[in-house]
């Protein structure tokens, strides 16, 4: 019997480009606005820059490639905050003949700020990115979303959320003079698991 995959959204929160001011003609300035708009996460894979070298290691990605559509090079609605892996994988790939033709049949790319992006890609119960449609499969392979680092970083993120919540709960109980020994043990275990995943990431990128 075929195993049923439990689908989760590929991203924790759908990003929204909020900047509507003047057009900045440097990637550096645009990046300052893109980072918070995308929660410091890659637009495509949702990897956090926290575990990927930080803000300076992330790129300004041009959804419609600047090599083909020079007039969109600094248009904010065409820009994305991206990890180096997704940005380099996508490069100047573009299926259409104009800037608005991003998909032809089951090939092409969807702007991650578009709701439709989440109909084509998701995650399984373990945090691996999975394709949900033929178009999603095209994006999955073109952006190399099968890389193990995406699974590791997703789980690092989830464990860190739990670690921080436990730390806050321990602090709250300590302030009320309550017994925290059980929570401290759980927190220590979660920290060990976090370190194990971090070691996996280091080995993956070695």
Give each language-model segment a name.
Residues 2-44, 69-71, 77:
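Short, charged surface segments at domain edges that flank catalytic/cofactor-binding sites
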Residues 28-32, 115, 164, 181:
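Generic alpha-helical secondary structure signal
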Residues 42-45, 83-86:
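Short cysteine-rich clusters marking metal-coordination/redox-active sites
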Residues 47-79, 90-105:
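Histidine-centered nuclease catalytic patch
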Residues 90-165:
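Domain-level detector of nuclease and nuclease-like folds
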Residues 138-206:
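C-terminal, charged low-complexity interaction regions
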């Amino acid at each position: 019997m075929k195993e049923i995959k439990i689908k989760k959204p590929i991203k924790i929160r759908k990003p929204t480009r909020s900047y509507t001011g003047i057009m900045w003609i440097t990637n550096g300035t645009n990046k300052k606005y893109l980072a918070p708009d995308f929660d410091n996460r890659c637009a495509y894979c949702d990897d956090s820059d926290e575990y990927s070298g930080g803000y300076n290691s992330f790129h300004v990605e041009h959804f419609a490639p600047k090599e083909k559509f020079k007039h969109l090079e600094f248009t904010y609605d065409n820009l994305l905050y991206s990890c180096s892996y997704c940005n380099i994988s996508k490069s100047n790939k573009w299926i259409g003949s104009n800037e608005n033709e991003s998909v032809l049949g089951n090939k092409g790319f969807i702007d991650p700020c578009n709701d439709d992006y989440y109909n084509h890609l998701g995650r399984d119960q373990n945090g691996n990115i999975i394709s949900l449609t033929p178009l999603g499969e095209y994006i999955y392979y073109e952006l190399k979303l099968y890389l193990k680092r995406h699974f590791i970083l997703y789980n690092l993120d989830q464990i860190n959320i739990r670690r921080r919540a436990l730390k806050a709960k321990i602090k709250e109980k300590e302030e009320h003079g309550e017994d925290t020994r059980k929570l401290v043990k759980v927190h220590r275990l979660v920290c060990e698991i976090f370190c194990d995943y971090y070691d996996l990431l280091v080995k993956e990128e070695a």
